[in-house]
């Protein structure tokens, strides 16, 4: 690996300090650190644009929490570059490597001794009339939800063109297995092992209590048509990118062509991470 991209929380002093040390460590090994220009200015360095990074990097290191990693994954998803997540945040389902483990993990990666978890992504589009007005890749989830003062949302749903139901709810979450421990979990959705290939539809506070989460095959295409008029409704992707929806908009969600490749610790298994992060067995 000759070039490694570094992503971090821009205004976090701790991330800035760790990034500076990491840059020095990489340069001592004749590896070119690629830092996005805005963050690079905080480090007193020159950088590259975020659009250039996917074509230049052989690997990426993310310093922060899951939100920072998810943002990097959407940027890099089209290239399937391995991403090493270092947890400097709080929960850290995806950034499972600790700061103490950073340099041993990097040494292992440079030596080719690392394990990669291939994570399914989603492609979400919004159609308005005959036009596609919004298109994005998603690692965790695509969420349709109402604004603070909006009433219940009516959404017609189809799977592979077949009518499923018309949801009356505060919103709807369409998630990947990776996203099952995110918003989906808070809405009483199932925890899905990240190695599985599937989509999950989870209603948010449905008006009908028999509307339960549904797990679909990975090849399924979920189509949602917004029926509600004059309501404040939004589509949010990974909790970071979104747009306001209008009555009649059609949202299509399907498996994306590319995946996110996460570098995982060989010393930890998924169930250990799950047990630790969710504090199972504690009183």
From Swiss-Prot:
EC number assigned by the record: 2.7.1.23
Binding site for NAD(+): 66-67, 140-141, 151, 168, 170, 181-186, 240
GO molecular function: ATP binding; metal ion binding; NAD binding; NAD+ kinase activity
Main subcellular localisation: cytoplasm
Keyword terms of this UniProt record: ATP-binding, Cytoplasm, Kinase, NAD, NADP, Nucleotide-binding, Transferase
Cell compartment(s), UniProt: Cytoplasm
Pfam entry (one): NAD_kinase_C
InterPro entries per the UniProt record, alphabetical: ATP-NAD_kinase_N, ATP-NAD_kinase_PpnK-typ_C, NAD/diacylglycerol_kinase_sf, NADK
Single GO biological process annotation from the record: NAD metabolic process
Known cofactor(s): a divalent metal cation
Keyword Cell membrane: no
GO cellular component: cytoplasm
Record carries keyword Heme: no
Annotated catalysed reactions: NAD(+) + ATP = ADP + NADP(+) + H(+)
Catalytic residues as annotated in Swiss-Prot or TrEMBL: 66 (proton acceptor)
SUPFAM superfamilies in the cross-refs: NAD kinase/diacylglycerol kinase-like (SSF111331)
Main function: Involved in the regulation of the intracellular balance of NAD and NADP, and is a key enzyme in the biosynthesis of NADP. Catalyzes specifically the phosphorylation on 2'-hydroxyl of the adenosine moiety of NAD to yield NADP.
Family affiliation: Belongs to the NAD kinase family.
Protein name: NAD kinase
Natural source organism: Geobacter metallireducens (strain ATCC 53774 / DSM 7210 / GS-15)
Organism taxonomic ancestry: Bacteria, Pseudomonadati, Thermodesulfobacteriota, Desulfuromonadia, Geobacterales
């Amino acid at each position: 690996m000759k070039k490694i991209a570094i992503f971090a929380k821009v205004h976090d002093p701790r991330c800035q300090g760790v990034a500076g040390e990491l840059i020095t460590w990489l340069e001592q090994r004749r590896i070119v650190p690629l830092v996005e220009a805005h963050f690079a200015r905080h480090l007193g360095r020159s950088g590259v644009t975020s659009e250039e990074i996917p074509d230049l990097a052989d690997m990426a290191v993310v310093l922060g929490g899951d939100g920072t990693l998810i943002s990097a994954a959407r940027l890099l998803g089209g290239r399937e570059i391995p991403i090493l997540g270092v947890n400097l945040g709080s929960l850290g389902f995806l950034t499972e490597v600790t700061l103490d483990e950073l340099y041993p993990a990097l040494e292992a990666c440079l030596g080719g001794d690392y394990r990669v978890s291939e994570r399914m992504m989603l492609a979400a589009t919004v159609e308005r009339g005959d036009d596609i007005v919004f298109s994005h890749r998603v690692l965790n989830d695509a969420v349709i939800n109402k604004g603070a003062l909006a009433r219940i949302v009516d959404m017609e749903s189809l799977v592979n063109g077949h009518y499923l139901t018309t949801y009356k709810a505060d919103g709807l979450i369409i998630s990947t297995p990776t996203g099952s421990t995110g918003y989906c979990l808070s809405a009483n959705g199932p925890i899905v092992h990240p190695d599985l290939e599937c989509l999950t539809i989870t209603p948010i506070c449905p008006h009908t209590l028999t509307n339960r989460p549904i797990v679909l095959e990975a090849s399924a295409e979920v189509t949602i048509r917004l029926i509600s008029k004059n309501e404040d409704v939004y589509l949010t992707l990974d909790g970071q990118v979104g747009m306001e929806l209008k009555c009649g908009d059609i949202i299509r969600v399907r498996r994306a062509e590319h995946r996110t490749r996460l570098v995982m610790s060989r010393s930890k298994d998924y169930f250990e991470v799950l047990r630790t992060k969710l504090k199972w067995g504690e009183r």
